[in-house]
Amino acid sequence: MKLAPLLLLATLATSALNAQPENKPIRVAIVGLVHGHVKGFLAALPKNANAQLVAIVEPNTALAQQYASQYHLSQSLFDADLEHMLTSQHPDAVLVYTTIKDHRRVIEAAAKHNISSMVEKPLSTTMDDALAIRRAAREHHVQVLVNYETTWYSSNAEAISEAQSGKLGDVRKVVVHDGHEGPKEIGVGPEWLPWLTDPIQNGAGALFDFGCYGADLMTVLMHGQPPISVTAVTQTDKPATYPHVDDDATVILRYANAQAVLMPSWDWPFARKDMELYGATGYVITVASDNLRTRYHGEKSESQKTAPPLPENESNSLAYLAAVLHGEIKPQGDLTSLDTNIIVMQILDAARTSAKTGRTIELKPLPE
């Protein structure tokens, strides 16, 4: 006789859970319009239910007007002053499309308002700035995430999964190719090109612009362990076009039992972002965003396959950011997390020093 009331209570509890509303879209503000990747965000926003755009901070009124017209944005969204926007709107997160040099300034300002940040790769231009960003995140208990296009490639996720599951045996060598024909050659806009080719505002040329991708992937593959040493060679093959920065680099990362070769360049004949992982018993090569070439121990020839799709909340930057802010994902040790990207900056900083001095740089432990 007591079973029926219990069943009724269980049914009511289940109905109540099912009736709970879905997570509301996160409120985001764009800070800066000088990084061309903002165009991808604005183009995708109307189809993305994870976020609501509440403000855009851009002091260049002509550039702000250009974007307002191109993307049919209300003038009420725009603000020329960062602090005023943070105070008046208090978004859940800021999406930072400034120069890389400006990342620290924006992140620290947002953190003081307990607002999280997502920046475009890389995290910063210097190790000092990276550590200052980490201090701000810790002090104010906010998230700082770094957006890489390749994070949302299912091919990379599958390659990392196979490596970490032992399917390839011990990973011995990783080769990463990233880049394109050059920013000027592909038509980067006038608001972007000057600072992208400035060693102060961008940190370096192709070395930072595309070297960060491989450093990010390798740091996750090595479970957050930094390399023992970094050796880098850079050069400028097109000095008339890029007189102040490198346009081609090769970086060797040495680990206790593995080696990575990163090949960032603005001199590729076409755009590419691919990775080769070689283990003791197999290899996997990523092809574009969702395909792989593989060969495992005992197989006589190479095979091709499509990577399984990513979970919905890890399929793009906005879905991921919303999942983090809603507490569904803890960004620890993944491609986007701050701890991973502190190591990425350690690698890039050492690579820049190595290229400048002609010496291999042995990495020292970072302050906690």
Language model features with spans:
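C-terminal helix-rich "cap/oligomerization" subdomain common to oxidoreductases
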Residues: 21-22, 93-95, 323-368
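Beta-strand-loop-alpha-helix segment that lines the small-molecule cofactor/substrate pocket
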Residues: 88, 93, 99-100, 104-151, ...
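Active-site loop of classical SDR/Rossmann-like NAD(P)-dependent oxidoreductases
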Residues: 36, 59-62, 307-319
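Predominantly a Rossmann-like dinucleotide-binding segment in NAD(P)-dependent oxidoreductases
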Residues: 151-241, 358
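Bacterial N-terminal signal peptides
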Residues: 4-15
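Conserved SAM-binding strand-loop segment of SAM-dependent methyltransferases
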Residues: 75-81
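Contiguous beta-strand/loop segments that form the cofactor/metal-binding neighborhood of enzyme cores
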Residues: 216-291, 318-330, 349-351, 367-368
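N-terminal Rossmann-like dinucleotide-binding module
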Residues: 19-71
